[in-house]
Amino acid sequence: MAKAIPRRSSRRNGRIGSRKSARRIPKGVIHVQASFNNTIVTVTDVRGRVVSWSSAGTSGFKGTRRGTPFAAETAASNAIRTVVDRGMLRAEVMIKGPGLGRDAALRAILQSGILLTFVRDVTPMPHNGCRPPKKRRV
């Protein structure tokens, strides 16, 4: 019969404290994806590494309330609160999608005190690409 391999504790391999909070981010990029059902706000550094994120669903809104402007405003303020504590002063904003939370999220970003260098709409638009799905008959 095979000899049992003794299990070693994985504590020695794991990190004891989180090292993410030590990094200071003076400039970043705020990505807002506003769909009709939800709004997702992701804050990255200039290289594209995610620093903080939040969505209307993680902010406590469920169902159809996730698509509301108030939910988008709450999600944006939750995502930005952590990066303001880390020292973010300037940011670029990339807004994607047709949802109701576009303007509300931008309003929450402006109220946070971060200086915006530019706001860009990066909603993907087809140059007559794929055929769209057929119209709904309700």
From Swiss-Prot:
Q: Name one GO cellular component term.
A: chloroplast
**UniProt KW Chloroplast keyword:** yes
Q: Name one GO biological process term.
A: translation
Keyword Ribonucleoprotein recorded: yes
* Matches recorded under PROSITE patterns: RIBOSOMAL_S11 (PS00054)
Q: Which Pfam families match?
A: Ribosomal_S11
Where is it located? Plastid, Chloroplast
UniProt GO molecular function: rRNA binding; structural constituent of ribosome
* Keywords, in A-Z order: Chloroplast, Plastid, Ribonucleoprotein, Ribosomal protein, RNA-binding, rRNA-binding
Looking at the record, which segments are called Disordered?
1-23
Q: Report the sequence similarity comment from the record.
A: Belongs to the universal ribosomal protein uS11 family.
> Could you describe the subunit structure of this protein?
Part of the 30S ribosomal subunit.
* Protein's UniProt name: Small ribosomal subunit protein uS11c
- Organism, as annotated: Ipomoea purpurea (Common morning glory)
